[in-house]
């Protein structure tokens, strides 16, 4: 009897070891597939463009980046992305607050429309803005004649396109936090006579700082590389409305691969730094 029990115990132990070995082998295979995919899809292209941009060293890269047209394109990209980020951080937070805290007719439709910019091709976004604000259109002509504001083929058009494309990021970053927020303190503050603005500023807003910042950084990173809508609305005018992404296309078409790679490296570095910061903020929030 004892011999049978011992044999069963040994068989069970062997089966458990085999299952554990197969599971470990499966995990290693899965990791290997993921690493190979990541290497082919992301790391090799990054390595190639960095190697190409640095083939004349840091001095050559700096020379290409500081050329007047390239530098102006980078600065315009950063300026328009910054303005867009400030506006969308405010409006995205207010939109998320309205969608979470208030019930109104058409709320479901508006909540669905928030994600529409992510689904629409950015070229279509550019065409819509040209049709609406073009110099030959009623609204575009009115803004130009009455206020001296040009939207299309000018920096304001770039900002408008970026506002449309990146609008969902802050809204979707803030909404889950508002949904999970305990409203006990807000109710207590209301009972004690605090006004709605005081409650929002002192109680509701502080927990939203991290998600708003994360959404803002994602918006900024997305805006840096935007091409489709910008190339339609900006007009690609050097030293005026040419962004970094459009400049890179021009350098590729001019067969100046070094210039295209150099500016691309700067854009990649900025985007990567922002993504690292977003990950850090997410980790801190969790």
Cite the ranges covered by each PLM segment.
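Transmembrane alpha-helices
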Residues: 32-37, 116, 120, 164-183, ...
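Periplasmic/extracellular loop-to-transmembrane helix junction in inner-membrane transport proteins
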Residues: 16-28, 49-86, 101-102, 251-257
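Short, Lys/Arg-rich, polar N-terminal cytosolic tail immediately upstream
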Residues: 1-24
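C-terminal transmembrane helix and the adjacent membrane-cytosol boundary/short C-terminal tail
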Residues: 2-9, 29-33, 44, 48, ...
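Hydrophobic alpha-helical transmembrane segments of multipass integral membrane proteins
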Residues: 40, 75, 79-91, 95, ...
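Interhelical loop and adjacent transmembrane-helix boundary motif
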Residues: 24-27, 61, 68, 230-276, ...
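Transmembrane-helix boundary motif in ABC transporter permease subunits
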Residues: 18-22, 83-115, 127-131, 142, ...
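Membrane-interfacial helix termini and adjacent extracytoplasmic/periplasmic loops
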Residues: 16-21, 58-66, 71, 107, ...
């Amino acid at each position: 009897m004892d011999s049978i029990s011992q044999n069963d115990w040994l068989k069970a132990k062997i089966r458990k070891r085999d299952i554990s070995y197969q599971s470990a082998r499966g995990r290693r295979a899965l990791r290997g597939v993921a690493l190979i995919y990541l290497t082919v899809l992301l790391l090799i292209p990054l390595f190639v463009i960095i190697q190409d941009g640095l083939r004349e060293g840091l001095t050559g890269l700096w020379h290409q980046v500081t050329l007047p047209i390239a530098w102006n394109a980078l600065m315009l990209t950063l300026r328009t992305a910054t303005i867009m980020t400030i506006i969308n951080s405010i409006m995205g937070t207010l939109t998320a607050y309205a969608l979470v805290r208030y019930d109104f007719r058409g709320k479901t439709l508006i909540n669905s429309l928030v994600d529409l910019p992510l689904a629409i091709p950015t070229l279509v976004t550019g065409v819509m803005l040209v049709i609406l604000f073009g110099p030959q259109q009623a609204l575009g002509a009115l803004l130009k004649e009455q206020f001296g504001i040009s939207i299309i083929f000018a920096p304001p058009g770039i900002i408008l396109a970026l506002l449309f494309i990146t609008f969902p990021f802050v809204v979707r970053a803030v909404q889950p936090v508002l949904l999970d927020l305990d409203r006990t303190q807000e109710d207590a503050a209301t009972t004690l006579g605090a006004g709605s603005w005081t409650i929002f500023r002192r109680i509701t807003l502080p927990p939203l700082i991290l998600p708003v910042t994360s959404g803002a950084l994602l918006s900024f990173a997305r805006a840096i590389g935007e091409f489709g809508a910008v190339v339609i609305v900006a007009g690609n005018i050097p030293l005026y409305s040419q962004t970094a992404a459009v400049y890179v296309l021009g350098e590729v078409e001019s067969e100046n691969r070094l210039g295209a790679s150099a500016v691309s490296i700067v854009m990649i570095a900025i985007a990567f730094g922002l993504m690292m910061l977003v990950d850090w903020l997410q980790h801190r929030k969790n």
